[in-house]
Amino acid sequence: MKRTFQPSNLVRKRRHGFRSRMATPTGRAILRKRRAKGRNKLSA
């Protein structure tokens, strides 16, 4: 059986990266929440 996690930096960036977060209103809300919480890393 194939494992579910097949790492790929390109897909990681495209799906969870900063620019993809900024592209949608909900993504910006996520970044706002993470800034408010004081996260060192905002996105992948």
Swiss-Prot record:
The gene is rpmH. One of its GO terms (biological process) is translation. The keyword Ribonucleoprotein applies. Disulfide bonds: none annotated. The keyword Zinc-finger does not apply. This is Large ribosomal subunit protein bL34. One of its GO terms (cellular component) is ribonucleoprotein complex. PROSITE patterns: RIBOSOMAL_L34 (PS00784). Keywords: Ribonucleoprotein, Ribosomal protein. GO terms for molecular function: structural constituent of ribosome. Residues 30-44 have a biased composition (Basic residues). Residues 15-44 are annotated as: Disordered. InterPro entries: Ribosomal_bL34 (IPR000271), Ribosomal_bL34_CS (IPR020939). It comes from the Bacteria. Belongs to the bacterial ribosomal protein bL34 family. PANTHER family: LARGE RIBOSOMAL SUBUNIT PROTEIN BL34M, MITOCHONDRIAL RIBOSOMAL PROTEIN 34 FAMILY MEMBER.
